[in-house]
Amino acid sequence: MNISGIKDCYGCGVCATVCARQIIDIALNENGFLEPRITDEGKCTNCRLCVDVCSYSHKELSLKASCVKSFAAWSKDAAVRRKCSSGGVGFEVGRTLIGEGYKVCGVRYNAERNRAEHYVATTIEELIPSIGSKYIQSYTVDGFKAINRNEKYLVTGTPCQIDSFRRYLQKFKKEDNFVLLDFFCHGVPSKLMWDKYVHWAEKQVGSLTYVSWRNKFTGWHDSWAMAIDGSEKGESVKWHESYNLSIREKKSFLNTRLSQGDMFYRLFLSDACLGKACYEKCKFKYENSSADIRIGDLWGTTYQDDEKGISGAIAFTDKGNNLLMKANLECVEHPLSVVAEGQMKECAHRPFFYKKLMTLLKDNSLDIEVIMLRSGGYLKSVSYTHLTLPTNREV
């Protein structure tokens, strides 16, 4: 038995990581989502490892835990807090563990390959590209395969990625070597949509060299913003005005926000083109997690006047709680209802025009501006301060 019959799954890539025969490939399907395929059935030994580590194939989570403590949290380092999407908890956890001899498997955006991808960082400098949210599906395989199970790691990812990865660690009895961190996940949009958005951006700034999905130029509550560096030479951009932490030369620069009608965010936050599993089979909303720590924006009324950024942080294990206490963080304990107030309580609902939108996204002759004109009237109104509004179900 293997994962050959699985379609429209989470695309976490752990099956490809665990396969000793190296016959599982993770690639984009026709709708622009990662999924596995067996490249040579004849070499399969039916060891079942790929199925055993597959979160999509199990109803229960791999960690039977409940919230130990929940916090509002933010970095004590003002520069870190300013550059991170919310409060900087993820970076501070990584920085603390690197100081203790851990490596970090996090996510960066690879502009040359136009994808988010997992990679291994061993120094603080190498950790910097992991700063900030990346609201597209991450290719995990190379990063996960680079991990040595006998060493100590922090591994971050979406809840489904982390649930599968914990199953992988349990198979080899290596959980003690790892700290696992996930986040409140909205779902992942189709790569077809992202590719069209990139094409639109490149017409303005040339080939992309860096992308940031969030910035606080106008405050944390208006931080749903794309900040993009292009290859074309442009006006000088001061370092503190760019979200690229490594900018060193004149580059063209694009900044577009949800509050100004940014097309990526209009489609993404309207739940218009998420993966099938995000609509139908996500079991990780609210406090359901297999991680030691879950993080995300602490939206809601308690910190509605804060514009520097506040993270919600939930410890599901004593390991996670102890780590939050010793990291360079200001932590204020709150009930879970406060920490997760603005987060999704259930799966997104597939809109009735989903199939039509996917057809438009597959049409190579259509730019994203045309697609927005044809579908914009169907998109729900999205408030950038509260993202759990209802939408029409598919009929």
Predicted regions and their residues:
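Catalytic cores of enzyme domains
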Residues: 181-355
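Iron-sulfur cluster-binding cysteine motifs and their immediate structural context
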Residues: 2, 14-37, 48-66, 288, ...
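Local cysteine-cluster metal-coordination motifs and their immediate loop/turn environment
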Residues: 7-21, 45-56, 161, 274-286
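Ferredoxin-like iron-sulfur electron-transfer modules
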Residues: 1-13, 24-46, 74, 260-266, ...
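A short alpha->loop->secondary-structure connector
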Residues: 171-182
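Flanking helices and flexible, charged tails adjoining ferredoxin-like Fe-S electron-transfer domains
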Residues: 42-149, 339-356, 366-374
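Gly/Ser/Thr-rich loops at beta-strand to alpha-helix junctions
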Residues: 85-88, 111, 155-165, 187-189, ...
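Conserved small/polar residues in nucleotide/adenosyl-binding loops
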Residues: 385-391
